Amino acid sequence: MTTLAWFAGRSMVLDLAALTSAFTVGYLLKSTSTPTSTPTSTDKAGTPPGSTIHHYGYPQGSVTKPNNSKTEKENGSPKDSKGNVPDCPYKYLVGLYGHHHFAGFVEALQPTLKDEDPEKYTLVLDIMDAVHLCLILVDDICDDSPKRKNQTTAHLLFGSCETANRAYLVLTKVINRAMRTRPVLGAELVRALELILEGQDLSLVWRRDGLAAFDAEEGGDKVSVYKKMAQLKTGTLFVLLGRLLNDGGAQLDDVLLRLGWYSQLQNDCKNIYSGEYANNKGAIAEDLRNGEMSFPVVVALGDQTTSSQIRKAFGSHSDGDIFDALDALQSSCIKNKCSQALQEAGRGLENLLAIWGRREHMDSLGS
């Protein structure tokens, strides 16, 4: 599918209330990690009326906001200039990733922008920080992730409600700022958010309704179906950067879409094959445990020697079945296919990948 086909027919301006609603529905229906909710009806495969759905997300029990106690400081959480943990989930995450996380890309793609148009340079980087980090804030809530970059996740420090609301607030402010000062960039931002949330919503539906929903998807082989979702959810983030730099121009769409696909593949593989990544996230095979589709899972579903283990794990979510599925994912056949796909996806992107980093070692893939 071409990039132009993806974006065809997308409105340049989306009502802000609709955007906020989409953001909320796409993420926060995952309301608890322990209780279940019962739908009244459904037209989705694999979720018959009256059945219960296990929702991953908000942790049970009390959470405390960060303080300046000795215990908090010993945890190594990001501090401000006075040695205090930031009293804001977004600033806390900025402390983990660094301010203007995409600056290296901007300097490589438009090296003169900072001097020629410093206002645009700052706005572009602020937009990219807001989209990237706010999506991470809410994604960690959905996955009930205990760690991010080997630090306690924001929602476990500040609470899920405050963390999610702060993400909406930061995004709303940057949308209004862009629409007011650079309307073309504002329109690109809104369009990108719609596409990203469309991809994330599809991923969450698959997680909610299980493999029956994924199997029911049309559009060719299952790798292609998964890739389409990943290009919406992750590829659009990188495409947005090119659109912002080129005032809506599509000159960089193809290469940045490829970079986004590589990033998704790399993240999926690290989730299964990197002990370092598991330590930084505080969980092994988090995607598999959450019943979430990933590239290794899709590959294993298409292999007769591993399909049954994956399907059993997605059906039961039991620890024993999950460990059996993890063994299947780490078999040489599946590892080799994932390694080959990762190498092919990265061809010609070496310079951009060097800027992106993400160098956690993957023992099982020999990288």
UniProtKB/Swiss-Prot annotation:
Region named Disordered: 32-84
Cofactor section: Mg(2+)
GO molecular function, one term: metal ion binding
Consequences of knocking out this gene: Simultaneous disruption of idtB, idtC, idtF and idtG eliminates the biosynthesis of the whole spectrum of indole-diterpenes reported to be produced by C.paspali, including paspaline, paxilline, paspalinine, paspalitrem A and paspalitrem B.
Cofactor note: Binds 3 Mg(2+) ions per subunit.
Keyword Cell membrane: no
Ligand binding (substrate): H132, R148, K233, T234, Q264, N271, K281
Pfam families in alphabetical order: polyprenyl_synt
Alphabetized UniProt keyword annotations: Glycoprotein, Magnesium, Metal-binding, Signal, Transferase
Glycosylation sites: N67, N150
Free-text function comment from the UniProt entry: Prenyltransferase; part of the gene cluster that mediates the biosynthesis of paspalitrems, indole-diterpene (IDT) mycotoxins that are potent tremorgens in mammals. The geranylgeranyl diphosphate (GGPP) synthase idtG is proposed to catalyze the first step in IDT biosynthesis via catalysis of a series of iterative condensations of isopentenyl diphosphate (IPP) with dimethylallyl diphosphate (DMAPP), geranyl diphosphate (GPP), and farnesyl diphosphate (FPP), to form GGPP.
Protein name as it appears in the record: Prenyltransferase idtC
Organism annotation: Claviceps paspali (Rye ergot fungus)
Lineage: Eukaryota, Fungi, Dikarya, Ascomycota, Pezizomycotina
